[in-house]
Amino acid sequence: MFIGLTGTLCSGKHTIARYLIEAHQFQYITLTTDPRAKEFNALTFDSAKEIQEFTTKNWRSNYVICHISTANELNLYRKRPFFLLVAVDAPLIVRYNRWLSRNSLENNNPAMLANFVFESDALMYHSKKSYDSDMTIPVYKQAKLAELSILNPFDNVEELHKHLDSLDITNPDRLRPSWDTYFMLLSELAARRANCMKRRVGCILVKNNRVISTGYNGKPRNLKNCNDGGCERCNEGAKCGVDLGTCLCLHAEENALLEAGRERLEGPGHAILYCNTCPCLGCAKKIVQVGVQEVVYSQAYGMDEKTAEMFCEAGIQLRQHTPVSLSSELEGDSKLLSNALINHFQMTTDLFNP
């Protein structure tokens, strides 16, 4: 794995790089122009192309880089399927305090904050020509391309490390999805086609790891779409699970089951239904009837317990799977993260309201 860390000024990129080195045996790799190369005992190269070639030859090893400044560099690294771009950020006041500490400055000069904000914004938004005439890429553009975003408001390294452990950064699923992740992502893609104005649900029916059919929720064909006013129940804002009998929309699971047909699901092989939302009781009955052997879902729904009881009685395995690529940093150690943010906002309030 080759991890590229990008982020705002004093967000903690190098601290996270050190965590990867110490906890996961990564090697710091960078350009010879990186001023912190010696500090990390880094492998240094004269160009991004040389780094790309080296990591390609040694792709089974783990490397981390924090020095990505041009679009050309980033594009070279992103061509490789073992590269993961991670964006790091922290609240402004947190980064300012770190900046003061790094430069051994006292927080008693109002001009210091202005200097920091100017320096931070220059890194975040400013494009300029570098020494090799390649256009630099601002941090905000790099962050848009990141596969993972990390918020780092922590006061000490120990808490940050706990949070990073909970994020499971080095999970191979982030580079090449498992079958569960692959099909769940397909169900999320199918959900984008939903025309129900209440909820986006997508479903994938699979047998022996081969897609049989797909489905999403919305009105039957030749009828006005729900999001065009076609379903009175949905458009009147009925609560979850209420008046489902008057809903004119087909559920994603129903669409997928109708498309597949019972004959394609029965017989040798293992039929699995992937849905980004746990099936309702009405869909659960149909799933049992057609012979699906396993149901995998990502998001909970209001009827989960009743659905689970029916599947258990029918001998159908029900389990939850949320791909790491669909998880945000808040789904790591959320309590630890929330406490750190609360502490810093309290410090900010005390600072400006003495």
Q: Which residue stretches match the model-derived regions?
A:
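Small-molecule kinase domains that catalyze NTP-dependent phosphoryl transfer to phosphate-bearing small molecules
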Residues: 71-74, 94-164
